[in-house]
């Protein structure tokens, strides 16, 4: 294979990929006298920042305007925040096989599981991120029920947002 521009070992791949090495990034938040120092494993995406800022300053969300993202205020305040039932989607319709080596795909993360649908190749990969953070053990043939559940979510989400293939 070609050398990657980045290395996020032990995570798989790097910038431009929907594997963990390309999408998992640290988030640091500092607010003196408001947020206690600590560490959280709460799953957060970029769309969660705006609802969180509104929540922190006491402004109510307008559901017709704030369609994406959820507040992670509870996590910042040191309270448990269970996002395990919340699906998070990524869509990358423009492959870059020569620059980053990635292929067009739609990805969903739900709890510990992550499914990548390489729709142009007709290939699906399924991983349990709690047991396999490096995404080396494809479970799509071993866990067909979980694969099919997440694949249906991907298809429905793509249709709901009119995602291009």
Question: What are the residue ranges of the model-derived segments?
Answer:
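Short glycine- and hydrophobic/aromatic-rich loop-to-beta-strand nucleating segment
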Residues: 27-29
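Intrinsically disordered, low-complexity polar regions and short flexible loop motifs
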Residues: 132
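Cytochrome P450 catalytic domain signature, combining two hallmark sequence patches
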Residues: 84, 146-148
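C-terminal cap/loop subdomain of S1 sulfatases and analogous C-terminal strand-loop tails that border
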Residues: 1-20, 34-36, 42, 47-129, ...
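Conserved nucleotide-sugar donor-binding catalytic segment
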Residues: 24
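Residues within well-ordered alpha-helical secondary structure of globular protein domains
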Residues: 55, 78, 142, 153-156
């Amino acid at each position: 294979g070609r050398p990657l521009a980045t290395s996020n070992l032990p995570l798989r791949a790097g910038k431009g990929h929907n594997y963990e090495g390309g999408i998992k990034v640290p988030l640091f938040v500092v607010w003196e006298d408001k947020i206690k120092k600590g560490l959280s494993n709460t799953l957060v995406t970029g769309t969660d920042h705006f609802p969180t800022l509104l929540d922190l300053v006491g402004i109510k969300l307008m559901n017709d305007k704030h369609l994406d993202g959820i507040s992670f205020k509870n996590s910042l305040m040191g309270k448990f925040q269970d996002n395990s039932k919340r699906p998070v989607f990524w869509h990358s319709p423009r492959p870059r096989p020569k620059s980053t080596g990635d292929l067009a795909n739609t990805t969903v993360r739900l709890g510990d599981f992550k499914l990548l649908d390489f729709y142009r190749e007709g290939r699906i990969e399924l991983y349990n991120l709690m047991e396999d953070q490096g995404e080396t053990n494809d479970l799509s043939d071993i866990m067909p029920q979980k694969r099919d559940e997440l694949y249906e979510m991907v298809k429905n989400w793509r249709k709901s947002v009119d995602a291009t293939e």
